[in-house]
UniProtKB/Swiss-Prot annotation:
Transmembrane segments: none annotated. One of its GO terms (cellular component) is cytoplasm. This is Segregation and condensation protein B. Keywords: Cell cycle, Cell division, Chromosome partition, Cytoplasm. It is found in: Cytoplasm. Belongs to the ScpB family.
Length: 193
């Protein structure tokens, strides 16, 4: 094998490696959750050892740089996370964006839960007149509501209530600090007339 051919193989190998790293980074970014190394290997159609090696190279490339993210590898799963020293700024962003990131359905559902808690999904659906599964899922994911028990009836449906995060996000000291529903309804009807 001549020297030019060896150099070409090396260039191709580096190019393939960089392509894999790019794909892995995209997958980690879009997932937002830990991804099993085995799943990454399946997606990339390569061996788990190769994925582990690529991940370690990527992890090392983030260390010591002025980057806001790092790769976290734990129990054969990997996740792209923000660096702890930036957490104060990330929290500020999340607090300002929470209201913007909630759909109308999620805001309606959250209002019902805040005023009627603890409440079941079926009761929420009856008040809204439509299914609320997706809105409830979104609110649970954002840790704005929580499961706070089960109703003691056949089927034992889950009861939902607000969390401490709900209070923080809306700047409330306690759940009692939310405006009285009757007062809001009176104010709303005055504005319409």
């Amino acid at each position: 094998m001549n020297k030019d051919h060896e150099e070409q193989l090396e260039i191709n190998e580096v190019s393939q490696k960089n392509k894999y790293k790019s794909i892995i980074e995209s997958l980690l970014f879009m997932s937002g959750e830990p991804i099993n190394i085995k799943d990454l290997a399946t997606i990339l159609n390569c061996k788990q050892d190769k994925v582990s090696s690529l991940l370690n190279e990527m992890k090392n490339s983030y260390v010591g740089k002025d980057r806001g993210i790092k790769i976290l590898i734990h129990n054969r799963a990997v996740q792209l996370v923000t660096k702890p020293e930036n957490s104060i700024y990330v929290e500020k962003l999340l607090k300002t964006n929470i209201r913007q990131s909630l759909s109308q359905a999620a805001l309606e559902t959250l209002s019902i839960i805040a005023y009627k808690q603890p409440i079941t999904r079926v009761a929420i659906d009856e008040i809204r007149g439509v299914k609320s599964d997706r809105a409830i899922y979104t609110l649970l994911e954002k840790n704005i509501i929580k499961e706070c028990g089960r109703l003691d009836v056949p089927g034992k449906p889950i009861l939902y209530g607000t969390t401490e995060e709900f209070l923080k996000f809306f700047g409330l000291d306690s759940i009692e600090a939310i405006p009285n529903l009757e007062d809001l309804l009176k104010e709303f009807s005055k504005e319409e007339n």
